Amino acid sequence: MSLLKEFKEFAMRGNVMDLAVAVVMGVAFNKIVTALVDGIIMPCVGLLLGGVNIAGLSFTVGDAQIKWGNFLQNVIDFIIVAFAIFVLIKLINLLQRKKANEPEPVTSEIQLLTEIRDLLARNSSKI
């Protein structure tokens, strides 16, 4: 089997395609969360702290500038993304549990076989 053919089979497997979609959606979601944190949450926190730009907060030790405000902003980004993923996974697990608890629909063949069994059982008891 050629290397190209093996790669094509690998790339077209369901799991790989699902992963690719998840990565693209994750990148897009990260942009939304970053915009939320940078544009809404951090300015509000800055207003509560007296109009301070949180991302610009830093202190200097010797020649090194420690940008702790930027770090704080990224921590808030991470917490929001992690919480959103947690909620999404909880929702998916809940839906999967509900689906697993639903009885499987009875097919027409099974229903017909059940009726035949019941008729045979009734007829054998009459003999």
UniProtKB/Swiss-Prot annotation:
Membrane-protein topology: Multi-pass membrane protein
Lineage of the species this protein comes from: Bacteria, Pseudomonadati, Pseudomonadota, Gammaproteobacteria, Legionellales
UniProt organism field: Legionella pneumophila (strain Corby)
Location, primary (coarse class): membrane
Location of this chain's protein in the cell: Cell inner membrane
Family stated for the protein in its record: Belongs to the MscL family.
InterPro entries (UniProt xref): Mechanosensitive_channel_CS (IPR019823), MS_channel (IPR001185), MSC/AndL (IPR037673), MscL_channel (IPR036019)
Pfam family, one: MscL
Transmembrane segments: 9-29, 32-52, 75-95
GO MF assignments: mechanosensitive monoatomic ion channel activity
Full protein name: Large-conductance mechanosensitive channel
HAMAP family, A to Z: MscL (MF_00115)
Keyword Ribosomal protein on entry: no
Gene: mscL
Known function: Channel that opens in response to stretch forces in the membrane lipid bilayer. May participate in the regulation of osmotic pressure changes within the cell.
Keywords (A to Z) from UniProt: Cell inner membrane, Cell membrane, Ion channel, Ion transport, Membrane, Transmembrane, Transmembrane helix, Transport
A cellular component annotation (GO) from this entry: plasma membrane
Subunit structure: Homopentamer.
Keyword check for Ion transport: yes
